[in-house]
Structure formats: structure tokens, C-alpha cells
């Protein structure tokens, strides 16, 4: 029995290595925050003691977009299959918008079936549900599944790539240009560590993707084809929840690794490491640094003075706000808060209407802002009500 079990395990491992395939390309929450900015903070970035052994690197806290470490972060470099973060983002947006469903069947075309690199060996005319295509794309970085999804969404890979570049522009990815949807070496295909963090941050806004990025081992084709995640952080790093690995001879070993602890979501980008081990060790070092030195905390709500109401039944309006979770240095001072409210508002006002804002500061630097909203309705005085008030005053004087 023991020998049979051992043989079964060996056979399964062999099957996994066959399914992944040898190739040049590696096969190895919606945030509730409302922040005052979308750009990175470089003035506060805290450097590690030494330079990481890779071409470029970046550590970012996803909720705020604050950069905690940056190394050669805007250099245009090949990123291999890390490209698929943008491909996955477009798929997730299509799912969330109702354009496609996880149960929809994808028919494999000629281009997808003849892709090289890491793959799940799709055949022309084969049909597979979107959910399994996503597993293949995200878990084992399958180029054929990526192209199949691109064709399913946009009609052709070239049209899909145009959408990728348009979305990159919308996200402010100024040092990025995609020439394909999978990341294999191609002229004019490049990105940078900062831009990889930007698209990773956007993808994290789609919670569904984490159901795929956190898969360690799974199957497709009704259990006939095994999958093993190329991202080793998922199995070995506490809190790891994504995102994408990549490798080509030109790009070397790349990674956008994500992890979440105690409500803080970090993104560690590594581009151009010489070995897979260096890639994961460097990402771990960045993540360890972030979790050791920073935390996300929600400040206490301060009591706000009511706002005067003009032409309202009641003279004042109660207002409130919801403090956001804010990134702070461990052991540092809590951010200060400053309410910005009008002297008065005109009735009518509906409960929930925005009437001002509260701004949060770290020293003199604005770090976040949230709206101040009406805690109740403020009805407008009608002519009848006004006349009644006047009449009451007159009668009261007698």
C-alpha cells in the first residue's frame, strides 16, 4: 500500500511537470479608501539598507498608492508574463460589467492553439469555460489561454492589445507599451516597476481575481490536467495573495507579488533578477520591510459642529463622516484631522448629501480626505410654514 501511494505521488508530480511544460516563458478587496491623490509619494519613501539584486524594484501600499521603496522604478524593461496582469484586469472588468460570465464557453482559435511558451496545450476548436481559462492564465501563466481570452473578448489579439494600451494610459502607466497580451519577447513591448505596481493595484480592486491568484494546485478539463502555481509566495509567505510571475531569457525573472496582513495590502515588484530564488527572496525582503515598519490604522472620528441651514424648517443640520484606513509608520504619530465645512447650506438637503470634507495630514502633508455628509434630512420651509412662524411671533408679542 505504501509503495502504491509513493508511486501515485511520483506519477502526479510527473503529470504536473508535463502539464506545465518546458519553455522560455516561466511555468515554474475593493478598498474603501478615498484618498486625496492618485500619484506616488516619493518624498517619504524609506530606502532599504542595500540595493536589491535585480534591474528594478518597488514596494507599494495598495490602499494609498504610497511607495515605500523604489529602485530604478521608471526604467523601461521587458516584464515577461507579468504582462498578464493587464490581460487579467481586462478580463475581470469584462466579468464585473456583465460582458462575460465565468460559465461562458471560450472556443480556441488558430493563433491561441499555436502559441509557444508556457501553455495548457489548447487545440483548435476546443471549448473551455472562462473560469478554467482564468485558472490556466493566472495559475500557470498559459500563453494559449491568454490569447484565447483575448480573442474571445476583442475578436483578435491585436484588438485586445489596443485595449490593453488604452487602459494603461488611463492608469497613468507612462513608461509602458504592450505589443502582445502574453509577454513573450517582442520589439516595443516593455513596462517599468512603477507601472507594474499601478496595474497590480487596479487589479486588486477586483476581489474575484484573488480566488484564482491564491490557488496553489488545481485542475482543468474535469480533473484531467493538473496545475501548479508559478508564484511560490502563495505557498510559503504568510499573507501572500498574488499576483504574477514572469520569465524570458531577455526579461530574466520577474514578479509582482502581493500580500495582506492586518488590513494592509502590499505590492512588491521585482524585475530582472538572475534567478527565481533571487526574485522571490527580494520580494520577501520588500514585503518583510513593509510589514515591519508600516501599518494601516483608522483614526477616531471627531465630533463636528452642526451646519447652519438657510430657509430650512430646522435651523441646523447634523453632519458626520467615515474615517478612512490610513497608512502610518509603526510608532509614529496619528494623522491630524481638519474639517472643511461651509458657513451654511441651503435647504433642502437629503441625508447622505456631501456638504464638506475632512482632510487628514501627516505633519503638513495631506494624506487623505473623506466627504462630510448630512446625517439627516433638512427640509425647506414652505410659504405656509414661514407665514405660520411670522403669525406665531405676532401672536406671541400680544
Question: Where are these predicted regions, by residue range?
Answer:
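Sec-dependent N-terminal signal peptides of Gram-positive bacterial secreted proteins and lipoproteins
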Residues: 2-24
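A generic local structural motif
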Residues: 2, 10, 43-45, 254
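Hydrophobic alpha-helical segments, especially transmembrane helices
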Residues: 3-4, 85, 261
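Residues in and immediately flanking transmembrane alpha helices
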Residues: 15-16, 97, 298-301
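Domain-terminus/edge residues, biased toward the C-terminal soluble/receptor-binding domains
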Residues: 173-177, 185-398
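Structural motif marking the loop-to-transmembrane transition
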Residues: 1-5, 79, 130, 383, ...
Amino acid at each position: 500500500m505504501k509503495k502504491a501511494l509513493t508511486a501515485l505521488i511520483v506519477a502526479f508530480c510527473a503529470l504536473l511537470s508535463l502539464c506545465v511544460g518546458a519553455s522560455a516563458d516561466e511555468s515554474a478587496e475593493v478598498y474603501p479608501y478615498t484618498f486625496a491623490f492618485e500619484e506616488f509619494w516619493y518624498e517619504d519613501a524609506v530606502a532599504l539598507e542595500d540595493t536589491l539584486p535585480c534591474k528594478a524594484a518597488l514596494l507599494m501600499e495598495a490602499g494609498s498608492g504610497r511607495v515605500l521603496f523604489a529602485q530604478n522604478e521608471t526604467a523601461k524593461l521587458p516584464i515577461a508574463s507579468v504582462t498578464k496582469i493587464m490581460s487579467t484586469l481586462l478580463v475581470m472588468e469584462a466579468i464585473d460589467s456583465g460582458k462575460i460570465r465565468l460559465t461562458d464557453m471560450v472556443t480556441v482559435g488558430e493563433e491561441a492553439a499555436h502559441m509557444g511558451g508556457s501553455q495548457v496545450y489548447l487545440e483548435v476548436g476546443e471549448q473551455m469555460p472562462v473560469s478554467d481559462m482564468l485558472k490556466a492564465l493566472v495559475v500557470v501563466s498559459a500563453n494559449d489561454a491568454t490569447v484565447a481570452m483575448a480573442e474571445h473578448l476583442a475578436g483578435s489579439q491585436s484588438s485586445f492589445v489596443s485595449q490593453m494600451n488604452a487602459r494603461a494610459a488611463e492608469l497613468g502607466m507612462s513608461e509602458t507599451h504592450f505589443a502582445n497580451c502574453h509577454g513573450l519577447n517582442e520589439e516595443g513591448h516593455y513596462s517599468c516597476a512603477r507601472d507594474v505596481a499601478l496595474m497590480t493595484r487596479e487589479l486588486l480592486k477586483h476581489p474575484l481575481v484573488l480566488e484564482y491568484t491564491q490557488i496553489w494546485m488545481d485542475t482543468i478539463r474535469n480533473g484531467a490536467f493538473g496545475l501548479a502555481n508559478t508564484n511560490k509566495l502563495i505557498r510559503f509567505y504568510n499573507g501572500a495573495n498574488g499576483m504574477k510571475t514572469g520569465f524570458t531569457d531577455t526579461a530574466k525573472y520577474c514578479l509582482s507579488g502581493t500580500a495582506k496582513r492586518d488590513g494592509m495590502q502590499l505590492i512588491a515588484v521585482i524585475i530582472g533578477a538572475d534567478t527565481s530564488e533571487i526574485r522571490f527572496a527580494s520580494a520577501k525582503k520588500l514585503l518583510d520591510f513593509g510589514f515591519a515598519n508600516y501599518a494601516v490604522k483608522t483614526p477616531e472620528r471627531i465630533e463636528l459642529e452642526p451646519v447652519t441651514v438657510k430657509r430650512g424648517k430646522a435651523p441646523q443640520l447634523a453632519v458626520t463622516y467615515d474615517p478612512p484606513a490610513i497608512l502610518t509608520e509603526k510608532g509614529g504619530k496619528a494623522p491630524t484631522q481638519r474639517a472643511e465645512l461651509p458657513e451654511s447650506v441651503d435647504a433642502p438637503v437629503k441625508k447622505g448629501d456631501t456638504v464638506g470634507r475632512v482632510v487628514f495630514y501627516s505633519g503638513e502633508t495631506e494624506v487623505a480626505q473623506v466627504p462630510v455628509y448630512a446625517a439627516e434630512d433638512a427640509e425647506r420651509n414652505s410659504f405656509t410654514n414661514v407665514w405660520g412662524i411670522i403669525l406665531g411671533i405676532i401672536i406671541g408679542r400680544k
